[in-house]
Swiss-Prot record:
SMART domains according to UniProt: MoCF_biosynth
PANTHER family: NICOTINAMIDE-NUCLEOTIDE AMIDOHYDROLASE PNCC, NMN AMIDOHYDROLASE-LIKE PROTEIN YFAY
Top-level taxon of origin: Bacteria
Coiled-coil zones: none
Family membership: Belongs to the CinA family.
One Pfam family per UniProt: CinA
Protein name: CinA-like protein
CDD domains per record: cinA (cd00885)
Length: 408
């Protein structure tokens, strides 16, 4: 199996100002194509350190990928560091330079001298076109190894890497299936279904538990045992039932969208503690306007009363964080938007605002459907962002289950 090393470059990564999502993406994609990931590293914009780690990576792996450091500023040193590490020249590509100058003039009225820095290509390197940003990538061979230079912004890196991925195929390509679940603890899942999970020694089983996304079970093996992996997955699925919310690359909101489209249903949201996160997550899906009527972010009690029609007496008697309140919020949203389904969420995301009866993490959710209303109260853990994200996942899950019941 060929080995790969990923080097994420940038002071902003080392200092924790930006989260490195590129390495996660690259590692996952490379693993699917049969690469063993030796390591991922985060390096500062320091020429000597970069050269040292690049040379070590060349010794240890067949494929080295760098992300970041291809911009026009003085601290963008990846081109220089790679060229120095392998003893090759940097050559100015006149066509790229002119294109960068023309683009700068078009958008900014002038072209700073620094913009041309991005036109320098390592000797004998293939240019990887950047259709989103300005910094082109590079791919080259050295001493039987492949070195790839990619820009840092994920919106640029991902399509550029996908465009060259076929060139990196190995004879060790892997096949992976994923089952995504909610409502069943990782330990319970692995214990109760271990006979199915470990029925084939050629399949590697891995689980990933996330408070924000549930439990994912990953099945991986050589491409030639694809049918065997599918058999294990298909054997397990009926056992897990509605706990399975998605397979492979799909997310919870994707599944909800597909169910709504399939049944010609529409939905609306009334959000309090999630602050629009449910709606924002949903509209990430292209074409969602066909099923999404709208939403109300009613954070204050006044907004809940005046916009959604929650009775003042309900809030005074039960509180804004109560099933009684979210039921009326859901009914109000359904009426306002004339949707088939509506979902309402109200909770205490923290860090303050909790009490002995309703501690931080108390979240109430209601789903209004053609069949009636379903509501529940959850006691969630974590910080403010985790509680909001978990509430969003649970809200979509309650909606998913509600749609399934309505369709028979």
């Amino acid at each position: 199996m060929k080995k790969a090393i990923i080097l994420a470059i940038g002071n902003e990564l080392v200092e924790g100002l930006i989260v490195d999502t590129n390495s996660k993406y690259l590692a996952q994609r490379l693993k699917e194509f049969g690469y063993y990931i030796v390591r991922t590293e985060t390096l500062p914009d320091n020429f000597d350190i970069m050269v040292l780690r690049i040379k070590e990576a060349i010794k240890d792996a067949d494929l080295i990928i760098t992300s970041g450091g291809l911009g026009p500023t003085e601290d963008d040193l990846t081109r220089e560091a790679v060229a120095h590490s392998i003893g090759r020249k940097l050559l100015k590509n006149e066509a790229i330079a002119q294109e960068l100058i023309n683009r700068a003039i078009k958008y900014y009225g002038k072209a700073p001298e620094s913009v041309v820095k991005q036109a320098f290509v390592i000797e004998n390197a293939e240019v990887i076109d950047n259709k989103v940003g300005t910094a082109p990538g590079q791919m080259l061979k050295y001493d039987g190894k492949i070195i790839i230079l990619l820009p840092g912004p994920p919106v640029e890196l991902i399509p550029m890497f996908e465009s060259i991925l076929e060139k990196l195929k190995t004879n060790d390509s892997l096949y992976t299936r994923r089952i995504k679940t909610i409502g069943i603890p990782e330990a319970v899942l692995m214990d109760e279904y271990k006979d199915i999970l470990y029925s084939n020694s050629r399949i590697t089983i891995a689980t990933m538990a996330s408070y924000e996304r549930g439990v994912e079970v990953r099945f991986t093996g050589p491409i030639e045992i694809k049918d065997e992996i599918d058999y294990v997955v298909n054997t397990l699925l009926p056992k897990l039932g509605e706990s399975v919310y998605a397979l492979d690359d799909k997310e919870m909101h994707d599944v909800v969208y597909e169910l709504l489209v399939k049944n010609n249903y529409t939905v609306s949201f009334a959000e309090s503690c999630t602050g629009g996160l449910i709606s924002s997550t949903f509209v990430d899906i292209p074409g969602v306007s066909s099923v999404f009527k709208g939403s109300v972010v009613a954070y204050s009690n006044e907004a809940k009363i005046e916009i959604l029609g929650v009775s003042k007496e309900t809030i005074e008697k039960f509180g804004a964080v109560s099933e009684e309140c979210v039921i009326e919020m859901a009914q109000g949203a359904k009426k306002i938007f004339n949707s088939n389904f509506s979902v309402a969420v109200s909770g205490i995301a923290g860090p303050s605002g909790g009490s002995e009866k309703k501690p931080v993490g108390t979240v109430c959710i209601a789903v209004c459907s053609p069949n009636g209303i379903n509501s529940a109260t959850y006691n969630l853990r974590g910080d403010r962002q985790m509680i909001r994200k978990r509430s969003t996942l649970i809200a979509f899950d309650m909606l998913r289950r509600g749609i399934i019941k309505c369709q028979g």
